[in-house]
Amino acid sequence: MAKSLLRKINVDGSIYLWKTGHYHLKEFKHSECAERVTVYLKDYKNSPIHIHFRLEDNSYLPEDLAKSNWFINWGCLQNKNKVVNLNRPGVIKILIRYFISKEWNPETSKTPYHYYSGLKLLSELDFPEGIN
């Protein structure tokens, strides 16, 4: 995976650093490609969250790989009525708020947290029009 520069984002008064990147799975059935969003709370680099978006998890793959709605080179998920670009700060802000409200606490955690159902999460979260 190519090295990505960390980007800074302010979420509810806290500063986070984040990056996106492409990597390849070692074990896969349909596709080795995956994207990952990594987010750190500033000064808490030992407890990032890694959100994985695996093409392998795309629900359209078993039906017809050629009709897949996941564009790896763009880092976004597209379905009939929305596009979610993982490189947009507004999208990252929604993801950070979601994980802070659920289970991720970077100030008390001592280890990285991995979330492997990124595609499913994107389909469940509400992204306002124009955020991408």
Task: Annotate the PLM regions.
Residues 1-30:
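Short N-terminal edge-element motif at the start of the domain
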Residues 5, 26-28, 40, 85, ...:
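Generic structural signal for short, flexible, solvent-exposed coil/loop and linker residues
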Residues 12, 19-21, 40-42, 52-56, ...:
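A structural detector for beta-sheet-dominated domains
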